[in-house]
Amino acid sequence: MNKNYKDTLLMPSTDFEMKANLATKESKIQQKWLDDQIYQLRLEKNQNNEQKILHDGPPYANGDIHVGHTMNKILKDVIVRRWLMQGYYSPFILGWDTHGLPIEHAVQSKLGQKEFFKLSVLERIEVCRDFAFNQVQKQKEQFSSLGLVTDFKVCYHTYDKQYEIDQLKVFAKMINEGLVYQDYKPIYWSWSSKSVLSDAEIEYKETKSPSIYVTFKTLDNEVIGKDVNLVIWTTTPWTLPSNLAISVHPELEYTLFEVNGQKYLVGSNLYEQLIAKFNFENPKVIQKLKGSSLDKIKYQHCLYDQITGIVVLGEHVSDSDGTGLVHTAPGFGLEDFIVCKKYGIDAYVPINDEGCFDQTVHDPELVGVFYDDANKLIAQKLEARNCLLSLNFINHQAAHDWRTKKPVIYRATKQWFINIKSIKNQLVENINTVKYPNERYAKRMLSMVAERSDWCISRQRTWGLPIPIIFDENHEPILDKELIDNTLRIMEAEGIKAWYEHDAKYFLTNKYDPRKTYYKESDILDVWFDSGTSFNVLKENGIKDKATIYFEGSDQYRGWFNSSMICATVLNKTAPYKELISHGFTLDEKGMKMSKSQGNVISPLTIIKNKGADILRLWAASIDYSNDHRIGNHIIEQNSEIYRKIRNSLFRYILGNLNDFDFKPLDQYQLSLADLLTINHVNKSFKKIDQAYLNYDYLEITKEVNQMVVELSAWYFELIKDSLYCNDENDPTRKAIQATLNYIFINSLFRIAPILVHTAEEAYSHYQATNKEKSVYLIDPPALFEIKTDLDLDQLATEFSKLKDDVYAEIEKLRKDKVLAKSNEAVVYLSKQYLDINKHLVKQLKTWLNVAEVHFTKNDQITVEKTDFSKCLRCWNYFKELSKNNNEVCQRCSELV
C-alpha cells in the first residue's frame, strides 16, 4: 500500500518560532507593554495587597550604561517582577545620581575650562543640569532595552526640586540635633579634583613610595640629654617640612644607645631589627625608659635650624613596625592632628589646593614644587644634613581618587562634618535589625560604622546642593533653627537658585541686625548625602513603609548603604531597609577588570543588539552575583545554548502539542502513572525555584530550570510523542498528557517570566488557553497540583531511573556498534536484580523504555539484542504482529487511518 502515513499523524503545530530573533522582537514586545500599560495594570491589580519595595540605588548620570549597570538592573527587575507576579504591591522607581564632579568635568571639557569659569555660578549650574538631564535621558533609553518593569516617566533624580528640598530638611534636622559642626582637620584631599573626598570616593592602588629613616636631635633636657637622635620612619618625605612633633606611646619601652659617638633612641621591641638595618656595629645600650618619660622633650627640626618640635604622647603609636617614634605633622594626618590638638599645636599646611608647596613653607626652594616631586629634593637635603639613616623604595597600597585615578593626600582644611560618634550606638542598633544573606554581610556593615570617623559633608564644587548656612560678621556659622528653617522655606518657594540669586541678608529673620555683614557658605553637600536621602522618594510616591531591600555593589557598604543608614537613623530613627544584599564586580572572561586601555570592555548594548536582552538577562541570573563574576563572548554563547533549550525544548515543544487542547482543570483528566511521576518531579523543581526566589538565588533557579528541561526532554517528552502524534485526537491518554504539558508550561512560564521577560511574553501570546490575560505579567500564581495517591512516587521514580540508566547504557553500546539505529529496535533482557521490581513498573517498562520487548531473566547481566519484529510504518514502533487489515501498520494505527 505504501501510504504516506505522516498526514494521518497529529504533529505539533505552533507559530512560536524556533529561531528567537530577540533583537527584532524585543522592542515590539516592550512597545506593547507600554501601549497596554501592563506595569500600571499590575500595580492597580495589587494596590490593596502587601507592599514589597526594592529601592533603586541611583547610578551616576554620565556616559553609556556598562555591563555592571545592566547586571544590577536586571537582577533588581527579576526581584520586582517576581513580587508583582506573586501579587505584592511593588512599584519599581528608578533613580539617578545627578550632581558631582564628573558632570562638572564633562561640562568643562565640552565648553573649555576658561569659558566654564567665565559663567556665573547659576549659569554653571544650569549647563550642568542640562548635561545631566541629557545623560539621564540617554541612560533611560538604554535601560529600557533591558525590558524593565517600570515607568520611565516616574523616576527620581537628585536634581529634582522636591528631592533637593527633602534632602535639605534632613540636613536641617541634623543641625537641630547638634550633629553638624565645622572644623579644621585633615581629610582626604584630591589635588586632581581640587576637593575633599569621602571614604567612599577612595580606591586603593599599588604605588611605589620612598621609605626613609630620619633623625631629629634633641635639645637640652634632663631625661636623655642633648643631641640624642630620635629616629623616625616615613613613606611621605614631603610631609617632613610640616613636622611639629614626634609621637611616642606612653606605655612602650624605648632604648637609648650609642654607636660611633652618636646617641639614638628607638622602640626597644624594634632595637635589634634596626641595628641590623642600619649596619650599626658594637652598639652600647645606655638606658631603657618608658615613653611617658619623654613627654615634651624638645628637638631640632631635621631640615630647618630655626624650627623646633616636641615629643608628644600618643596611643596610636605602635612598635610592630617603623621605629616606635612617629613623625607627626598635624596638617597631614588625622591621628597627628588629634594628638597635637591635646598639646595646643595647630595644624600647619604649607601645601595648596593643587598639591604644591605655597609661600608659607620654611624653605624657598620648595615653593611651587608639587608634593610628590619634593621627595627627592627633601631626601637630598636630609643627606646633606646627616639626618638620613636609610632610603629605600617600597610598593604599598595608597589612596587614590576613584574618578581621576590620581593619588590623594591627607590635608587639613576647614570643612563641615556630621558627628557620627554621637549616633554610633543607634546606627549599630539599626544595622542589627536588618536581614542579611549571612553573617559576613552584617559584620561588613557593622565594621564600616565602627571604623567610620565623622562624615565630612562639604565639597568645594559648583554642581550640587548648596550648604544653606549663613555666617556672621566674624565668619562664625549661625546654626540657628529659626534661621535654617526660614532659609529652607525661601528655597522651597523659589527653588535652590534662590541661594545664589540673593545675598545672605535676604534669608535673615527679624531678630538679626541687617546693618551688620553676613556671608553665605559657598560649599556644596557631598553627593553621598544626596543619594543617602533617597529613601524620601518612597514617601513622595505614597509608599508608607521603609524599603524591603537595598541591592547594590559590594562597594556600597562604605557608600550608599552607609550614607542611607546614617541619614535614615537621624531622620526616622530607623534603618532605611529591612534586607540588604550586595553583588560583586563584573570582570572579563579571563577574570580581569574591564578597561578601555586594555581593550576588554564588553558593551551590554552590543550584546542586546546582537543576541537580545533576554540572553543578557539569562547571563545575569546564572552568575554567582555575590562574588566577582565574568562575562565574555564564550560565556554569552553558553547562555545562548541554554536559552535555546528553554525556548525550544520546553516552550515550543509544549505549545506545539497544545494546539487542540481543551484547557480543563488537571484533575478532570485520567492521568497515567507516567504523568503523575512527571508532575511529582516538576513540582519538586517548582518548589526549589520558589525557595530560591525567596533567597534571591538566581543561579539556583537557572540551574534548576536547565536541569528540569534536560530531564523532561530525556524521558517524558520522548515517551509521550507516540501518544500525542499517533493516538486519536480525543484519546483520554493523549488528553491527560496534554493536561500535564499545560501544567508544566504555565508553572514553568510563571517562574521563568521574571528572567526571560520577552520570551515569556512571546510564549504566552501563542498560548491558546481561554480567558487569557493581556500579558503573562498579569496572571495569578498557578497553584501546584496536589497528587492524591497511595503510591510512593519518589521511590518509583528512583527505582525506574536506576533501571533506565542501566538499560540505556547497554543499548548505547549497540548503537555505537551500529547494531541498533534506535532504542525501539531493542529487546531487553533484565538481570536477576530486577526480578523484584515494583509491580507498578512491570507493565510500563516496554513503553517507558521505548523498546520492542522487555524480558525478566535470572541472568547476572542485562543484555540487549535487535528485535526481529515488524515495524509499523505509521508510529515506527515494532510489533510481533501488525494489523490483519493492513500489514504496514499496527492494530492501533490501523484503526486510525
UniProtKB/Swiss-Prot annotation:
Monomer. The keyword Ligase applies. IleRS has two distinct active sites: one for aminoacylation and one for editing. The misactivated valine is translocated from the active site to the editing site, which sterically excludes the correctly activated isoleucine. The single editing site contains two valyl binding pockets, one specific for each substrate (Val-AMP or Val-tRNA(Ile)). ATP binds at K596. One of its GO terms (cellular component) is cytosol. Catalyzes the attachment of isoleucine to tRNA(Ile). As IleRS can inadvertently accommodate and process structurally similar amino acids such as valine, to avoid such errors it has two additional distinct tRNA(Ile)-dependent editing activities. One activity is designated as 'pretransfer' editing and involves the hydrolysis of activated Val-AMP. The other activity is designated 'posttransfer' editing and involves deacylation of mischarged Val-tRNA(Ile). PANTHER family: ISOLEUCINE--TRNA LIGASE, MITOCHONDRIAL, SOLEUCYL-TRNA SYNTHETASE. A motif ('KMSKS' region) lies at residues 593-597. Binds 1 zinc ion per subunit. The gene is ileS. Keywords: Aminoacyl-tRNA synthetase, ATP-binding, Cytoplasm, Ligase, Metal-binding, Nucleotide-binding, Protein biosynthesis, Zinc. CDD domains: Anticodon_Ia_Ile_BEm. This is Isoleucine--tRNA ligase. Belongs to the class-I aminoacyl-tRNA synthetase family. IleS type 1 subfamily. InterPro entries: aa-tRNA-synth_I_CS, aa-tRNA-synth_Ia, Anticodon_Ile_BEm, Ile-tRNA-ligase, Ile-tRNA-ligase_type1, Ile-tRNA_ligase, M/V/L/I-tRNA-synth_anticd-bd, Rossmann-like_a/b/a_fold. Its EC number is 6.1.1.5. SUPFAM superfamilies: Anticodon-binding domain of a subclass of class I aminoacyl-tRNA synthetases (SSF47323), Nucleotidylyl transferase (SSF52374), ValRS/IleRS/LeuRS editing domain (SSF50677). It is found in: Cytoplasm. Its main location: cytoplasm. Zn(2+) binds at C872, C875, C890, C893. It catalyses: tRNA(Ile) + L-isoleucine + ATP = L-isoleucyl-tRNA(Ile) + AMP + diphosphate. GO terms for molecular function: aminoacyl-tRNA deacylase activity; ATP binding; isoleucine-tRNA ligase activity; tRNA binding; zinc ion binding. A motif ('HIGH' region) lies at residues 59-69. Its cofactor is Zn(2+). HAMAP family: Ile_tRNA_synth_type1. L-isoleucyl-5'-AMP binds at E552.
